[in-house]
Regions:
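Short, basic/low-complexity N-terminal boundary segments at the transition from targeting/disordered tails
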Residues: 5-52, 65, 167-173
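A composition-driven surface/loop motif
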Residues: 2-20, 24-27, 32-33, 223, ...
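Acidic, low-complexity, intrinsically disordered interaction modules
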Residues: 40-142, 146-155, 159-244
Length: 265
């Protein structure tokens, strides 16, 4: 189903909405607003089982891609629904060492029950309307084609949520899109860095070409390495905080490619 924003009807004056109509009836919509209000925080908390939300949640932020009234959307609420709300912290990779080094953290003492404190939205590939069919495919996104310089018809980069993990790292989910004459490319990226412990990147990529205007290729991947592994591989420290460079240095843990077919008129 299309992503629903809590308190969607109560938009702030500081609210930016952009719509771009594209080839073959595609419509790209982005919404950007401020960090969520106390009222929105309460609404999120009621709809989620997490004992703690990221420090910065942009409740109304959204990116959606629509054709013939069917959409795939990306929003913070649906992403946070994919965060593990019951896993014991010590069972999360690297968490035992992280907790041991930070016994005095006030935030950790306030945890009511175990959950994924990194806010990793595992397997969140976007929110799909039921009318869109999904099937596995051997097709791959043509990245060489994407390297060809073209006129950018539309570009947006939207942050969904972010947390500094008590100043011990960074957890950030964002989604960006660019449209060109040959098609459009969208990347949702979750970047996680837990100092002295690990780095994780979870990507969802969407690509639609004018050659196949009724379908989207969707690639989902999870990559991760411990800090020790990065040091052993001599990955420069400067790359650890570079969200564009670091994925190529991480170990691929999971990958899947699907074809999304949108209904015709």
């Amino acid at each position: 189903m299309t992503a629903k924003l809590p308190n969607e009807g109560k938009k702030s004056p500081k609210f930016l909405e952009c719509v771009h109509e594209f080839f073959n009836d595609w419509k790209i919509k982005t919404v950007e607003s401020h960090i969520m209000t106390k009222e929105q925080d309460e609404t999120f908390s009621k709809g989620l089982k997490l004992p703690h939300l990221p420090d910065m949640v942009f409740a109304q932020n959204l990116l959606s891609i629509t054709k013939n009234n069917s959409s795939i959307s990306f929003c913070p609420f649906d992403a946070l629904k994919n965060v593990n709300d019951h896993e014991d912290l010590v069972h999360v990779a690297g968490a035992k060492e992280w907790l041991e080094a930070r016994k005095e953290s006030a935030h950790l003492h306030n945890i009511v029950h175990p959950y994924d404190w990194t806010f990793s939205p595992i397997n969140y590939r976007g929110t799909l309307d039921a009318s869109i069919s999904v099937s596995p495919t051997e097709d791959k996104i043509d990245y060489e084609k994407l390297k060809i310089q073209e006129k950018i018809l539309f570009y947006k980069d939207v942050v969904l949520y972010e947390d500094e993990l008590d100043d011990n790292g960074c957890s950030k989910l964002s989604v960006k899109i660019r449209a060109m004459p040959s098609g459009f490319f969208c990347l949702q990226r979750f970047y996680l860095r837990v100092d002295n412990t690990l780095i994780r990147v979870i990507d969802t990529r969407l690509y639609c070409s004018t050659d196949k205007p009724d379908e989207i290729l969707r690639e989902y991947s999870e990559r991760e390495c411990s800090i020790k592994e990065l040091i052993d591989k001599s990955v420069p420290v400067s790359a650890w905080t570079d969200q564009n460079e670091i994925p190529s240095h991480l170990t691929l843990k999971m990958e899947a490619t699907e074809k999304l077919t949108f209904p015709s008129k």
